[in-house]
UniProtKB/Swiss-Prot annotation:
<dbReference type="InterPro" id="IPR017938">
    <property type="entry name" value="Riboflavin_synthase-like_b-brl"/>
</dbReference>
<feature type="binding site">
    <location>
        <begin position="145"/>
        <end position="147"/>
    </location>
    <ligand>
        <name>2,4-dihydroxypteridine 1</name>
    </ligand>
</feature>
<dbReference type="InterPro" id="IPR023366">
    <property type="entry name" value="ATP_synth_asu-like_sf"/>
</dbReference>
<keyword id="KW-0808">Transferase</keyword>
<feature type="repeat" description="Lumazine-binding 1">
    <location>
        <begin position="1"/>
        <end position="97"/>
    </location>
</feature>
<feature type="repeat" description="Lumazine-binding 2">
    <location>
        <begin position="98"/>
        <end position="194"/>
    </location>
</feature>
<feature type="binding site">
    <location>
        <begin position="4"/>
        <end position="6"/>
    </location>
    <ligand>
        <name>2,4-dihydroxypteridine 1</name>
    </ligand>
</feature>
<feature type="binding site">
    <location>
        <begin position="62"/>
        <end position="67"/>
    </location>
    <ligand>
        <name>2,4-dihydroxypteridine 2</name>
    </ligand>
</feature>
<comment type="function">
    <text>Catalyzes the dismutation of two molecules of 6,7-dimethyl-8-ribityllumazine, resulting in the formation of riboflavin and 5-amino-6-(D-ribitylamino)uracil.</text>
</comment>
<feature type="binding site">
    <location>
        <begin position="159"/>
        <end position="164"/>
    </location>
    <ligand>
        <name>2,4-dihydroxypteridine 1</name>
    </ligand>
</feature>
<keyword id="KW-0686">Riboflavin biosynthesis</keyword>
<dbReference type="InterPro" id="IPR026017">
    <property type="entry name" value="Lumazine-bd_dom"/>
</dbReference>
<dbReference type="InterPro" id="IPR001783">
    <property type="entry name" value="Lumazine-bd"/>
</dbReference>
<dbReference type="GO" id="GO:0009231">
    <property type="term" value="P:riboflavin biosynthetic process"/>
</dbReference>
<protein>
    <recommendedName>
        <fullName>Riboflavin synthase</fullName>
        <ecNumber>2.5.1.9</ecNumber>
    </recommendedName>
</protein>
<comment type="pathway">
    <text>Cofactor biosynthesis; riboflavin biosynthesis; riboflavin from 2-hydroxy-3-oxobutyl phosphate and 5-amino-6-(D-ribitylamino)uracil: step 2/2.</text>
</comment>
<feature type="binding site">
    <location>
        <begin position="48"/>
        <end position="50"/>
    </location>
    <ligand>
        <name>2,4-dihydroxypteridine 2</name>
    </ligand>
</feature>
Amino acid sequence: MFTGIIESIGNIGAIIRHNEDLSIVVNTNNLDISDVNIGDSIATNGVCLTVSKLLPSGYTADLSLETYKRTAFHSYRIGQEVNLEKAMLPTTRLGGHLVSGHVDGVGEVIEFKRNGRAINIWVAVPVQLKKYLSEKGSVTIDGISLTINAVYQNVIKLTIVPHTLAETNLVNINIDKKVNVEIDMMARYLEKLIKVDRYESEKTSNVSMDLERYGFIS
């Protein structure tokens, strides 16, 4: 689990293609990985990756073809800047919101405008995700915990404050940029609960109708 508070900006040092999957080398720059072990998780641009090898300059992680195709990683090249966050500890202050590192879809930056020292960006997200997004709700973009300012169909407006701009790769934002999108897990759990409640209610109603039809109740 992660918080969506970025600890460092790294970059992709190498992409190694195997028969059925890939490995990437991530240069961590100023991220302290002295407490990271092989098998630990690091959110890399919002994707939860498992460290397979530790290097003097960073780490190596494996990507399945599924992860490669379903995230913005398919558009990355060597040198691509990536937001980095180590897995949270029980003692970690939750400054953002709970983030799983399981990307729900790939969005695209369609517009951005300066707003004083901040920046407003508009991101088009996959249509199937729009039902999970609400004004003042949370969303994770490339691993960054952000608050949604407005929702227009499947487009969300976000304001990036100066500190977030300085500490993440959003400082180099551009039109058509592909971004990893993870919805707030609470929204997905709420949908599941509603579906279960609706199913149980319909099932109970159908049973009552059958009992009434056969004269067991009136």
